[in-house]
Every structure is written in structure tokens, then in C-alpha cells.
Amino acid sequence: WLITGARGAGLGIIMARTGDKVEHGRGATMFLTDMDRAGIEIVRDLDTLDRGFTGGHSEILLNDVRIPASDILGEIDEGYRYAQVRLGPARLTHCMRWLGAMNRAHDTAVAYAARREGFGRLIGHHEGVGFQLADNEMDIHMARLVIWQAAWALDNGSDGRQETAMAKVLCSEAAGRVVDRSLQVLGGLGITSDTVVSRIYRDVRPFRIYDGPSEVHRWSIAERLMRQQRKKNG
């Protein structure tokens, strides 16, 4: 399994099937257990594109792991429901991080465009550069509003699944566009370590995969729409 933050972790959450089958959010149980328990092995640390996670990403092998009942987290057979409850807010915190990454890259590009001259004027006044900065500003504004709306839905008692799924797709893909444009504005400087943008560029690409790839979220959004329509049709 590809597990983020496994290296150095003292505790791990393991979800296992405890019912005859997992359906309607029941049948799986969460366990909070020590990572040094017999049978839990970190096989290797993966060399991933990004470097932004404490503990990195590791491949873990579970081999005949025996966990006592005292390690049960919450109630038996409710693990899947617990996981679903935390997914929406967790995805939204990722969106907030990605918004910060977008802003950092964009601010770097704007500052550069406001001091670098080309063909007799600041490059930010050339449409080829200025339009990219304008597109960045709009993507960032959109991402911020999407995050606010999803957070509002959660604060007002909604499970937020549709809102957070849309936010996850929109923000992760916007981050890729914003950082790519920022690097382009910086030109040759952008691919060096002289600015932070090259590192952000590597960090943002996995965002469209972490916590569910964009394709899975698009599928889930569409499925909810179909379920809503079936209810309307009776």
C-alpha cells in the first residue's frame, strides 16, 4: 500500500472487513494500532515527484497482522462510515493548501513581470504575459470561492460530498494551470531553483491524483446527479 507519512509514524489506522460483506457503509472496522506491531513492515520509501509531505510516501506490507480488540477505533463495522465523514473536510483542507501554492507561484510571477523589461516595457504589459497573469487571477478567485462555498455547506450541516468533490477537482486542476502559467512567465528562470516555482510545479502535479483522482470525482458527481434525477422521477 502507498501510505503517506508512514515513515516515523508511531500509530497507524488500519481498516479491515469485520462483517460478512461491506455494504451500506457497514461491515468494516477501524483499528488504531502501533506501527511496530508484528507483521507491519515498511518495505520501501518511494521516490515521488513531490516533496511536500512529512514522512514522504512508503510502501507497507501487512503480513498476518494480529490486532487486539482493545485497538478498535469507534464502533465495530462503522469504519467505512467514519472514513466517509472525514473525507469531505480533509479534501477541503487540501484545497486550502493548494490555494496557497497557487498564490505563491502567481505572486512570484507577478513580481517578476512587474520588474522585467522586454522590447522597451515591462513584460507584464505585453498581452502574451499579462493575459496569463489575468487567467491566473481568475483561477485563484474561482478556487477561493469554491472553497468558501463548500466550507459553508459543511458548517450548515450538509455532508458536503458533492461540494467537496467539485472543490477537489476544480482546485487541483486550477493549481496545475496557475503554476504552469507562472513558470511560463518566468521563462528560463522558472525552471531553475532560483525561485520556488519549480518546486511548486513538481508538487502540484500529484494533486490531481491524491485523495481520489479527478476522474473518480467526476464519476461520483455524475452518479449523484443520476440518483437525484431518479428520485425526482419517482
Give residue spans per PLM region:
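Alpha-helical interface subdomain recognition
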Residues: 59-64, 78-80, 84-234
